[in-house]
């Protein structure tokens, strides 16, 4: 376990954790899909290998045995119809104030959970966030992350990580006079040390987030205080045209293997 002040970070080996005999709590998957993308217009419903991109995340959620319910949170009636076509529920249309490019994930999930509680008296124990910009992910990774949270009550959430290619121990701030100061100060002169002697660090991707509902409703957070890390090597986040091409090639190659 790594700790940083009040936050603790647990590293999980990428092993098969999920077991079919454990189904004791309600797990909700939420796929947030706003319509106002600026980098690539309507990227969440853009066709990739013949299907809207959001369809892949819906299919991943529906295929995961550990997920009990799948909803899409969107501000678009058009997106809602597409989501329903591929099997997701769309119990509400997200208010415009939670669909801007500055809206926080916390606002989006507080709204979704509040709506479900007030209108359906429904409150899951665990929430899985699957962003639609990741059309490639393994069902087993979703299952492993859910099961880890079920088996470890000390953890508030689980996040995907991968070893960082660029490490903060070799990074700097620079002031207006071009004077450098190191970002990391916990290791003396870390910038002069061989990389192999420095602590191993990870960056987070956003492919899968799993967290307890109470993290949002009681702690006003998307992670809580104890964050477990699940290593995932592949990461196909789509934000540019180049990303689309790479993901399409990967999906096509995977289909050809079947």
Locations of the language-model features?
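Conserved SAM-binding loop
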Residues: 46-47, 71-72, 129
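N-terminal nucleotide-binding beta1-loop-alpha1 segment
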Residues: 22-41
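Short, Lys/Arg-enriched N-terminal segments with co-localized hydrophobic residues
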Residues: 4, 8-21
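Hydrophobic targeting segments
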Residues: 26-31, 54, 69-70
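A short, N-terminal amphipathic alpha-helix
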Residues: 53-67
């Amino acid at each position: 376990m790594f700790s940083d002040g009040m936050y603790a970070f647990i590293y999980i080996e990428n092993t098969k954790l999920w077991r079919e005999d454990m189904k004791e709590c309600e797990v909700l998957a939420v796929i947030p899909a706003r319509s106002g993308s600026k980098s690539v217009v309507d990227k969440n419903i853009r066709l990739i290998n013949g299907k809207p991109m959001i369809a892949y995340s819906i299919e991943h959620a529906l295929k995961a045995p550990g997920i009990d319910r799948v909803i899409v949170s969107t501000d678009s009636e058009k997106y809602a119809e597409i989501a329903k076509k591929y099997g997701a529920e769309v119990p509400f249309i997200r208010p415009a104030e939670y669909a801007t490019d500055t809206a926080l994930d916390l606002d989006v999930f507080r709204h979704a959970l509040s709506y479900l509680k007030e209108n359906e008296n429904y409150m899951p124990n665990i929430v899985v966030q699957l962003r639609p910009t990741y059309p490639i992910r393994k069902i087993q990774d979703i299952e492993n992350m859910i099961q880890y949270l079920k088996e470890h009550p000390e953890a508030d959430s689980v996040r995907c990580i991968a070893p960082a290619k660029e490490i903060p121990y070799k990074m700097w701030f620079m002031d207006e006079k071009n004077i450098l100061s190191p970002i990391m100060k916990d290791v003396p002169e870390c910038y002069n040390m061989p990389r192999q002697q420095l602590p191993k660090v990870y960056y987070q991707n956003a492919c899968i987030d799993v967290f307890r509902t109470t993290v949002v409703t009681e702690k006003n957070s998307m992670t809580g205080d104890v964050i477990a890390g699940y290593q995932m090597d592949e990461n196909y986040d789509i934000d540019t045209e180049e990303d689309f091409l790479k993901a399409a090639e990967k999906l096509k190659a995977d289909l050809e293997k079947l």
